[in-house]
Amino acid sequence: TQGVSSAASDVYKRQLIIRMKTLLAKHRSIRKFRSEPIAPEVLQDMLEAASRASTCGNMQLYSLIVTQSRELREALAPCHFNQPMVTQAPCVITVCADVHRFSMWCEQRDAEPCYDNFAWFLNGVTDALLAAQNLCVEAEAHGLGICYLGTTIYTAEEIARILDLPKGVIPVTTIVVGHPDESPELTDRLPLDAVVHCEKYHHYTSSEIDELWAEKETSEETRRLLEENGLPNLAQIFTRNRYRAEDNLAISRNYFALLKKQGFFNN
């Protein structure tokens, strides 16, 4: 009986590993959603999965602001450049680094908090993003689609105002979640050699850089983008169109100002 039980357990483990590998390998960002709401028990599973993510000192230095009301999603939409998915998706989750809650607890226990500085902003960001990714994996396990919104840091001050964030709390990303209304192709990725280093950092040669990006640069999607943008190569699409120097500097200045306002620069 014990042997049968052990064999059954091994089969279950193998099936679980295969399912997890398949789930992670088929991830795609979804930008079109049906209006169907997320079942409360599914949302609860997602949030519980988020709460089990690794966290600095078991402090859970994050807050997940779950917005489902149409009114608030419409208020947030301009912060995300009015992308339709913000109002299409039934659930918008703003992920924040949060030292406010832990600091309050310390103060109420006669323990002086010391988390209003840049080091603890970084710890909060790490906690927040780990929780966010756990949430996304759980959502996809339920057959839902997700998309991270990088626009969060562009308009973080307005998001903080709309969501009434106190000092010690700052938005770091946003996730839209819902039932997919599209099935896009998988996007390409750089080969593992591009991102994995053995023992020490590998310093790339020019020819290695060419090789790592060769597949991306010769893809049909890249050819289409080059034609649309009238640019000679993929790198210039990033530097001249998508993420321009002047925009990057403006976003950085604005976010640094909000960090100071929210009390993260007492260094």
Name each region found by the language model.
Residues 1-15:
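Single conserved hydrophobic/aromatic residue that forms the stacking wall/gate
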Residues 14-62, 74:
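N-terminal capping/interface segment
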Residues 22-35, 107-109, 174-267:
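C-terminal helix-cap and adjacent tail motif
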Residues 27, 46-52, 93, 116-162, ...:
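Small-aliphatic-rich amphipathic alpha-helix that forms the alpha element of a beta-alpha
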Residues 59-129:
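Glycine/small-residue-rich phosphate/adenosyl-binding loop
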Residues 85-93, 164-186:
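A glycine-rich helix N-cap at a beta->alpha junction
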